[in-house]
Amino acid sequence: MRKKECEVTDTAVLQRILGRATLCRVAMVDGSEPYLVTMNCGWDGEHLLLHGAAQGRKLDILRANPRVCVEIDEDVQLVFGATGEECTANYVSVIGTGTVSFVLDPRTKRRDLNVILHQCHPGVPDEVLPDEALSRVAVLEVQFDHLSCKAKGATPRP
């Protein structure tokens, strides 16, 4: 990280940010072209969990190349100055690189979907999706090999 003064190295802070995130941006490479999507997410303490339709471009790309870069941010605030030169943004962000795996086991898929559900909608009861509905959903686990966190003009929330 270029600006070491912005780096957050406390792994507990990183875990809390991942445990609060409901949306993330997932970047991948389609041949020689970049491709980026916003996805709902959840954190099980080891993997970032993602879900989406069981077919489509992003899944085709990930089957060919499962490497991803993920970005999560929170507390984003634009700061306006008297001139354009004085404008900036304050934020806390997490960037991670890793490898996606497709969750195929129905039990694991249901568990992961409930992790995402509870993270995005706290307090809602577990949902038991029927097999037919489960077949229409892709669940992905991102195993990170690198994570970094940056806080610029903001303090990570407890």
PLM region descriptions:
Residues 8, 20-25, 122-125:
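Short Pro/Gly-enriched beta-strand edge/turn motifs at strand-loop
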Residues 42-78:
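A short mixed-secondary-structure module that forms the rim of ligand-binding clefts
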Residues 2-5, 75-158:
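Charged, gly/pro-rich active-site loop segments
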